[in-house]
Amino acid sequence: MIKNNSVVVVDIDGTIAKVGERLKYLKTTPPDYDKFYASCFEDEPIIEMVDLVKRLQSFYKIVFCTGRREQVRDVTETWLCKNGLFGDLLMRPNKDHRHDTKVKPEQLSNSGVLLQEIAFVLEDRDSMVKKWRSLGLRCLQVDYADF
């Protein structure tokens, strides 16, 4: 059993990885997620955030909770490892097109992590920050993203 306040939940895109040019694919109607995820392995790390998570790894269990699809799990795991980041990786099913505000809390619940075990969440996306906070979690917004 994990003790209370021993888990840090970390988003990936925009929080520890620079999304960059591929963000344009989410601004189309409908969003083109295939193209968006196709080049995620090229993302540059956000150095300050990667360094922070590396330090947190010594004190907390890290759970990466991302909106990325399972189809890019290998690439995502390689990217995390290359940047010295380790922890559980929660990803959405390939055909799940629901908004992150629905998917991410569900992923976390399905993983067995209890809300009281979470010390805080690192997130960039405004809608997710609001969602995490509505669940009673402390959420540190590391950047402002509205997509």
Task: Give residue spans per PLM region.
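Donor nucleotide-activated moiety binding/catalytic core segment of transferases
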Residues: 99-115
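Low-complexity, flexible helical/coil segments
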Residues: 44-48, 97-103, 120-129
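Residue-level signal for functionally critical sites in structured catalytic/ligand-binding pockets
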Residues: 16, 68, 81, 104, ...
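Acidic, Mg2+-coordinating phosphoryl-transfer loop and its flanking beta/alpha structural elements
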Residues: 108, 116-147
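Alpha-helical substrate-recognition element adjacent to the catalytic core
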Residues: 2-98
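Glycine-rich phosphate-binding loop signature in dinucleotide/nucleotide-binding domains
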Residues: 2-3, 59, 111-118
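Short, aromatic/basic amphipathic alpha-helical patches
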Residues: 76-83, 106-111, 131-136
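Surface-exposed amphipathic alpha-helices with a cationic face
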Residues: 53-57, 112, 133
